[in-house]
């Protein structure tokens, strides 16, 4: 990403960043982009926080546009305290003269801080479309087309499950409070403060909302190939027991109603996740290769049937004769007997013009009898150094074995 500088009519210098054609960005450009996204998200949260601060005490009046009539929207405080105020008057303390349901405040700044806290949470929820879009635009350039589609799908499902958990928590809250506040009503009467009550409501909403994401997390692990349906099916009973234990610990009120509602809802969602993994594994098994299930150091099976090697065919016909029969040598792959190698003769050097031919001495008679007219060839002498082959017996006082090598035939020398 590069920067272009331009000067306006008023003398102000404006710098605009130009994106590279290939989409690459430096670290400084990434930090600048992150700063821009964070500032936009924080600005949206600040605006919605102000709206939430006002909405905490004041509702939105009813209005109508033509045939469309919108009823009055209660204030945020009225919506949050409705589960508590829906209890019978005998289960809660009333301190106002008109018997209106209100929460207690035990410190001077409790009401202001509670209003700021609830306004900030409401602003964070109302601004979630904006800061989610900013996060999406920041991470999208680094994702492939397939990854963008999966991320958008997972994010949409996660948001739907969280909202479903929040609605379930809000519906189960009156039943949980009814059980808790009637356990010792013959001796005590409840007078909840605003801080403790709203903390209880927020904790219950977060527990339900985040717990509803567990089935989605299980499905994502199955898509990544970490867990499979056969593994989860064998541990279904253990999972149900773990879910009930988690619901008993996680619910802030520790009442049986909230625990049962959370546990039963999670069991249903986990069963849906298990059926998703079963369908996904069945579809993936149709397109899986045999080598995909092997480890990195295990050889894949090769289905190669052994085949016989055909015999080599000769380029000659059947009447061709070898060297022994007076014909030419067979090439590679030919058939026929292997011919006897021809004898090797001693190399000779032609005498130059300045040299006179030296008579070849007759060989010494051999004591061993010879058959026929076959005679041993003359002795050949191999001299060392730059000397050449010669038929004479050489120098060194006729001492063989020092500078000369004598043999009865050239075949013995070889």
Swiss-Prot record:
- UniProtKB keywords: Cell membrane, Membrane, Protein transport, Translocation, Transmembrane, Transmembrane helix, Transport
Q: Name one GO cellular component term.
A: TAT protein transport complex
> According to the UniProt entry, which residue ranges have a biased composition of type Gly residues?
323-336
Q: Where is this region: Disordered?
A: 1-21, 315-414
An example Gene Ontology molecular-function term:
proton motive force dependent protein transmembrane transporter activity
What spans are recorded as compositionally biased (Polar residues)?
403-414
Keyword Cell membrane annotated? yes
Q: Which GO terms describe its biological process?
A: intracellular protein transmembrane transport; protein transport by the Tat complex
Q: Where in the cell is it found?
A: Cell membrane
TM ranges are 45-65, 119-139, 157-177, 200-220, 238-258, 259-279
Pfam families xrefs: TatC
Which stretches are tagged as biased composition: Low complexity? 345-357
Q: How does it sit in the membrane?
A: Multi-pass membrane protein
Self-association and partners: The Tat system comprises two distinct complexes: a TatABC complex, containing multiple copies of TatA, TatB and TatC subunits, and a separate TatA complex, containing only TatA subunits. Substrates initially bind to the TatABC complex, which probably triggers association of the separate TatA complex to form the active translocon.
Give the family this protein belongs to, as stated in its UniProt record.
Belongs to the TatC family.
Report the protein's function: Part of the twin-arginine translocation (Tat) system that transports large folded proteins containing a characteristic twin-arginine motif in their signal peptide across membranes. Together with TatB, TatC is part of a receptor directly interacting with Tat signal peptides.
| Name by which UniProt lists this protein | Sec-independent protein translocase protein TatC
């Amino acid at each position: 990403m590069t920067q272009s500088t331009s000067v306006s009519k008023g003398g102000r210098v404006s710098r605009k960043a130009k994106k590279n054609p290939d989409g690459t960005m430096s670290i400084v450009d990434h930090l600048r982009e992150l700063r821009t996204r964070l500032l936009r998200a924080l600005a949206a949260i600040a605006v919605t926080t102000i709206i939430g601060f006002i909405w905490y005490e004041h509702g939105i009046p009813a209005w109508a546009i033509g045939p469309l009539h919108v009823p009055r929207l209660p204030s945020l405080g009225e919506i949050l305290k409705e589960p508590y105020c829906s209890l019978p008057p005998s289960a809660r303390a009333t301190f106002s003269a008109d018997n209106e349901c209100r929460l207690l405040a035990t410190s001077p700044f409790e009401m202001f801080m509670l209003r700021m806290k609830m306004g900030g949470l409401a602003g964070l929820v109302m601004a979630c479309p904006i800061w989610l879009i900013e996060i999406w635009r920041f991470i999208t350039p680094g994702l492939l087309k397939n990854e963008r589609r999966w991320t958008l799908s997972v994010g949409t499902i996660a948001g739907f499950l969280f909202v479903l958990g929040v609605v379930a928590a809000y519906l189960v809250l009156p039943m949980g409070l009814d059980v808790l506040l009637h356990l010792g009503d013959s001796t005590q009467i409840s007078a909840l403060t605003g801080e403790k009550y709203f903390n209880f409501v927020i904790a219950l909403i977060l527990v339900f909302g985040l717990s509803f994401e567990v089935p989605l997390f299980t499905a994502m692990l199955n898509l990544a190939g970490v867990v499979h349906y056969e593994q989860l099916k064998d541990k279904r009973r253990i999972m149900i027991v773990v879910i009930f234990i988690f619901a008993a610990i996680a619910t802030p009120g520790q009442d049986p109603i909230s625990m049962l509602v959370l546990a039963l809802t999670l069991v249903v969602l986990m069963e849906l996740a298990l059926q998703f993994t079963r369908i996904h594994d069945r579809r993936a098994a149709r397109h899986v290769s045999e080598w995909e299930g092997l480890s990195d150091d295990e050889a894949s099976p090769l289905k190669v049937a052994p085949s016989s090697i055909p015999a080599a065919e000769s380029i000659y016909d059947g009447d061709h004769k070898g060297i022994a029969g007076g014909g030419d040598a067979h090439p590679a792959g030919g058939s026929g007997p292997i011919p006897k190698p021809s004898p090797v003769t001693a190399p000779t050097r032609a005498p130059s013009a300045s040299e006179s031919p030296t008579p070849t001495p007759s060989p010494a008679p051999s004591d061993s009898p010879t058959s026929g007219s076959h005679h041993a060839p003359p002795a050949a002498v191999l001299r060392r150094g730059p000397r050449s082959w010669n038929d004479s017996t050489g120098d060194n006082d006729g001492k063989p074995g020092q500078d000369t090598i004598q043999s009865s035939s050239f075949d013995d020398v070889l």
